[in-house]
Structure formats: structure tokens, C-alpha cells
UniProtKB/Swiss-Prot annotation:
Name of the protein in question: Chemotaxis protein CheW
Listed InterPro entries: CheW, CheW-like_dom_sf, CheW-lke_dom
Keyword vocabulary terms for this entry: Chemotaxis, Cytoplasm
Role summary: Involved in the transmission of sensory signals from the chemoreceptors to the flagellar motors. CheV and CheW are involved in the coupling of the methyl-accepting chemoreceptors to the central two-component kinase CheA; they are both necessary for efficient chemotaxis.
Annotated ranges, domain CheW-like: 8-148
């Protein structure tokens, strides 16, 4: 279930496959330029590998694959959004991330039934702002224990 959005909450807007998504800034640690992940064998297909981010081994998820969307080309606009998830950081590859908005309660609506029905990541809320419709995505809906930790070597 998507975390409750509060009036005045700031959200990062990012693009995946031509659609705008938003995530609370409270879930985002940083936004990084593209760097090619090192492959890790035996992980879920949507886990691209790991990157060394300021000395921290960080698993990277291809958000397009996680949302069952078509392949894409890496461009100068491609970004990795670093998400703080439980006690680790996880990167999401997105087409671009270039906007921060402030959301008000009156702009938030429940998503119509069946939104993102072809994936196990549900979109439960939508922000209607000016001429934009933004799917609110919650890190917990994308990252589960298995996917986020299966790319990280045992720390024991």
C-alpha cells in the first residue's frame, strides 16, 4: 500500500517509458548520473547488478523491467534514483528525473482500478496537477526483501 501523502509534501518527478511518476523525497537519498552496473549472477531479471556509490555497494533495479515495460536505450538523461530502503540503498534506473513538486491533498486521487494491472507493482494514488497526471509510486511497492537484498553480497 502506498504511504499516505501529506499536504505540502515534496515529490521527485521522473519519467519511465514516457509516463511521469512521482516518489516522496523522504524515500530518495540522491539522484545520480548513469553508471553501468556490474552484473551479479543468479539475481532476479530486473536487477541489473551493483554500482560502487561513494564506497557503498548498491544494487540497481531496472524500473522498466520491474514494471514490465519495453527495453530502452541509455541516454544522457538516464538517471539512477537512490532509494533509502530499510537499512540499505537501492538504485532505480529511470529515463530521466528532473522535477520536484509540492503536492496538496486536493490534488491526490485514488488510482482507477486496474492501473498497472500487468505488473505486481500497484499504483494506488495519482496526483492531478495542472495538465499533468503523475502516478505515485512507493518504494515498498517496488522493493521487497527478496529483490533488494538478493543483489547484495552477504555481509556476515
Amino acid at each position: 500500500m502506498t504511504a499516505e501523502i501529506k499536504t505540502g509534501e515534496k515529490m521527485i518527478v521522473f519519467m519511465v517509458n514516457g509516463k511521469e511518476y512521482a516518489i516522496s523525497v523522504t524515500q530518495v537519498k540522491s539522484i545520480e548520473k548513469w553508471q553501468k552496473p556490474t552484473r551479479v549472477p543468479g539475481v532476479e531479471p530486473y536487477i541489473c547488478g551493483v554500482i560502487n556509490l561513494r564506497g557503498v555497494v548498491t544494487p540497481v533495479i531496472d524500473l522498466r523491467k520491474r514494471l514490465n515495460l519495453p527495453e530502452y536505450e541509455i541516454t544522457d538523461e538516464t538517471r539512477i534514483i537512490i532509494i533509502a530502503y530499510r537499512d540499505i540503498e537501492v538504485g532505480w534506473i529511470v529515463d530521466e528525473a528532473n522535477d520536484v513538486i509540492t503536492v496538496h491533498e486536493s490534488e491526490i486521487e485514488s488510482a482507477p482500478e486496474g492501473v498497472q494491472k500487468d505488473t505486481d507493482v500497484s499504483i494506488e494514488q495519482i496526483v492531478k496537477q495542472e495538465n499533468r497526471l503523475l502516478n505515485i509510486i512507493d518504494a515498498n511497492a517496488v522493493l521487497d526483501k527478496e529483490s533488494s537484498q538478493s543483489a547484495v553480497p552477504d555481509q556476515a
